[in-house]
Amino acid sequence: MTFKFVDLFAGIGGFHAALGAMGGHCVYASEIDKDAARVYQRNWGLKPDGDITLAANDVTMDVPPHDVLVGGFPCQPFSKSGKQMGMEETRGTLFWNIAKIVEVHKPQIVLLENVQNIVGPRHIHEWQVIIHTLRQLGYRVSEKPLVVSPHLIRPEFGGRPQVRNRVFIAATLIPKGKRDINADVDVPNLESVMMGWDPQKWNLEKDLPLDKLKSKSEKSAVALNETEISWIEAWNEFVEIMRERLGENNLPGFPIWADDWVHTKDLNISYDTPDWKANFLRKNAEFYTAHKTVLDRWLKKWNHLQDFPPSRRKLEWQAQNEKNLWSTVMHFRPSGIRAKRATYLPALVAITQTSIVGKQKRRISTREASRLQGLPDWFDFVDQSDSLTYKQLGNGVNVGAVYNVIRAQVIRDLDLLGEESALVKSILGAPSNPDLVLGAHSKFHELAQEQARKDEEEYLPLRIVK
């Protein structure tokens, strides 16, 4: 049993990995970034189309028929005409092109992914229009957002030690005889793959896992430079001093701003200072006043941190009772050096804030970052730079999250899809963990590429002319 899917805004293929592991084969992919498209083609044997606005519009429909449509689309503002919300209100945005494909082909399942801001106050209008449009097109979809992060999914179901909260829009075609486009429904239920799991049980070193790098080239690619090491050494000494001084008590949870350390009697906060900042300034003054002698000694040793850039004269301690800085996972952020326990990592992002593994005194490698997204170790990033690979991974979707969301969507909508359909049998008949399929490199890889070649030979684009 198998099904056909299209992969829009495909990136390097996180959606493809998840749906391919469920037995699906991709009949069309679209990715405008040439570097990401090259990685996609290398791994999946299918060359993505470029600009989706040229492939799906009022005149042309180059996207072939399919059962499932997936995509991590950009969130763009819609017009606010004051009229009835609907598909026309989305015209000029990439969601309109998605809706056009859905209108023409009526795939049984539509699964879209976006950042959490799409359900925030700034985008409430866009969210409402998206839900309304999908319902007008004949789909069951919840107006409540489904927010999923891989670190909340049990490892045996494809979870990963990465906080990556993403919103999924799970829409299922309603057969005409059952159609009630205004009926609300709950979001797909992922409780069975999250139940009983404590994210604090993640062990980054074992569960990712972290590699033991051997070659000089591997080590140099992720090594910290001397300046970065000096920043960490200075703040590590601070942590150890305060650990000895505070005993069993944790270090302060508020941001430590060394530039703003003054005695409480000398504290002067201007009237226009935001409340949150004034609060931190007061707490830093109280902290400095309570520990002035040891802090002055530490500052003197490190030249009052004058050799450090302003953002490195700040520490955000979120590592609870860890003994020192080198036992944590760190990030160099504009707001300071952030330290967390080595359980799970913050979200990979498309900018250079790569996680630093304190125990190994290095950044995570591109292969380790790839594992965070659920991609298998055979995944090939061709000959591109590491910075480009980190960027692509930061823009990507987590395989395990997609895999479990679409399975939960099918279970929620069995009454619409039918238990005997090939789509349902393929998805529900797949292993509970995508790693079990993706790990079998040769068989999975060869089947995916063989199917892509067949589809390319057989498919002739459908042209719509008005």
Show where each model-derived region lies.
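Conserved proline-anchored active-site loop of SAM-dependent methyltransferases
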Residues: 5-15, 19, 63-82, 109-115, ...
